Amino acid sequence: MKVSVDKDACIGCGVCASICPDVFEMDDDGKAKALVAETDLECAKEAAESCPTGAITVE
């Protein structure tokens, strides 16, 4: 699955990094970033579904 984060939509709540720390972390600007471009981890989907702004895409 391909993972991406829309930095403009991200509000920096950190839910994704809490749910799936192997895939997401918060950058120096307080925004989420994907640590990997692709993953098979189901938590990436859960993080995308939990994102309050829909900033995470998992395809």
UniProtKB/Swiss-Prot annotation:
Disulfide links within the chain: 20-43
Any GO MF annotation of the entry: 4 iron, 4 sulfur cluster binding
Keyword Protein biosynthesis: no
Keywords associated with the record: 3Fe-4S, 4Fe-4S, Disulfide bond, Electron transport, Iron, Iron-sulfur, Metal-binding, Transport
Co-factor note (free text): Binds 1 [4Fe-4S] cluster which readily converts to a stable [3Fe-4S] form.
This protein's record includes keyword Disulfide bond: yes
Function: Ferredoxins are iron-sulfur proteins that transfer electrons in a wide variety of metabolic reactions.
Name the UniProt record assigns to this protein: Ferredoxin
Organism: Thermococcus litoralis
